[in-house]
Amino acid sequence: MDRKLYISDVTLRDGSHAIRHQYSIDNVQQIARALDSAKVDSIEVAHGDGLQGSSFNYGFGAHSDLEWIEAVADVVGHAQIATLLLPGIGTIHDLKAAYQAGARIVRVATHCTEADISKQHIEYARELGMDTVGFLMMSHMTTPENLAVEAKKMESYGATCIYVVDSGGAMNMNDVRARFRALKAVLKPETKTGMHAHHNLSLGVANSLVAVEEGCDRIDASLAGMGAGAGNAPLEVFIAAAERAGWHHGTDLYTLMDAADDIVRPLQDRPVRVDRETLALGYAGVYSSFLRHSEVAAKKYGLKAVDILVELGKRRMVGGQEDMIVDVALDLKRAAGV
């Protein structure tokens, strides 16, 4: 494969979920220096739920998005800074502030069937001159054909790259292959595509490899898999696999391995791994960032987190409905007569 893969690190955004958005300034700078030294192409920085995600509903961050972005901008020289914006949480005002703080890439994220709400934010990002990405979350919840229709909308608004986003870590390799083929069939040849995997079924790396085989240009991954649920595709593992496949990725594997084990893993207050609870996310097709919220609710109401997560899956809850976790817990408690 002659083309160079674009390596997009998400340790400092999706990884924030794993520690309830409590990265210190020193943490983000240490991680960013290592990633920059390893020559990743971009480093995504924000609260786990994107710009202005710090809230009662999603969890308050140790710092503001702008403080984190500015801290990373101070220490990187190679990588571009990316950020995430969910329309309805972040605004174009927040996007402008992030740009002024140093972000040059924005991923505008919507549920996989709601691309139409991204129009204003994508258009404004293009006006700012940002690398503008459409990010279709929970991509397993619609058909490949419907996903392609939504991707085409984002492209029409000005997005120059569209992501298949397996927020629930629920897809297998055939699911990924079908979605990339559907996107490639309708998008312009010059429009890039990306893959954002979660590891809840231990398929994060495999799904990312299949995406590349189907022509995917950008791969999201994180050091030690640091991310919501069982984490994202572990960056160092994906790079090792890409290296063995003979693919051009441009990063230093050993620097990434050291950063994963020496810097990132020690920060985890709950191991980022496939276990009973995180497996339930992938099995039930639940938004990965529901994990920590569900564990808190389970402890509070004397329930099993797995039962809450499976019920959330049955109800087809999506990102942004974190407030329903307590409702589900109370329903389960009532049904059990406890």
Swiss-Prot record:
Protein name as catalogued: 4-hydroxy-2-oxovalerate aldolase 3
HAMAP family linked: HOA
MF annotations from Gene Ontology: 2-isopropylmalate synthase activity; 4-hydroxy-2-oxovalerate aldolase activity; manganese ion binding
Pfam families on file: DmpG_comm (PF07836), HMGL-like (PF00682)
Statement: the UniProt record of this protein carries the keyword S-adenosyl-L-methionine: no
Enzyme class: lyase
Domain Pyruvate carboxyltransferase per the UniProt entry, residue ranges: 5-257
Top-rank taxon, per record: Bacteria
This protein's record includes keyword Metal-binding: yes
Binding site for Mn(2+): 14, 196, 198
